[in-house]
Amino acid sequence: MPERFLVFIPAYNCEKQVPRVLNQLLDRQVAAMVTECIVVNNRSTDGTEAAVQSWMQAHPQAPVRLLRNDQNYGLGGSHKVAFQYAVQHNFDYLIVLHGDDQGDIRDVLPLVHSGRHRKYDCCLGSRFMPESRIKGYSTPVSYTHLRAHETSLHL
């Protein structure tokens, strides 16, 4: 049975960025990996929801679903919504891709294609790791980090 990947895009007031994020799903390799994508609108006050709906109409082949929180639950609350959705719909893996265009989903492809993702309960990516390509920052940023592919932590 093929592995089921859910992409979760938390969205709050990211009307201009969310179409770029959704466009990442159109990449051939990404589309082959992703079973479904949910965009969780956390009660945006701009045109985020309309931007997602417009994108979905323009790309009906993309397996994207828009969910709207009853109230603004914050980022953590939106994560809970996504985790619950993933469990209820029997997904094997959940990938978080922020709606404000912080990351590139293609960065996870080598991990998935190699099968290394199966060794860990959680894999975290960071744009601030030394080998990351940081875009749009005016000053160098240095962070101490743990590499998810080297360390597994069971909670």
Report residues per predicted region:
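Acceptor/aglycone-binding surface of glycosyltransferases and processive sugar-polymer synthases
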Residues: 69-88, 93, 105-153
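A short, conserved beta-strand element in the Rossmann-like catalytic core
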Residues: 43, 74, 102
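Short, well-formed alpha-helical segments that are part of the catalytic scaffolds
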Residues: 14-28
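Cell-envelope/extracellular polymer assembly enzymes that use nucleotide-activated donors
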Residues: 4-6, 36
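Conserved sequence signature across two-component system core domains
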Residues: 11, 40-42, 69
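A conserved acidic beta->alpha catalytic loop
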Residues: 41-50
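Donor nucleotide-sugar binding loop of glycosyltransferases
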Residues: 14-17, 44, 104
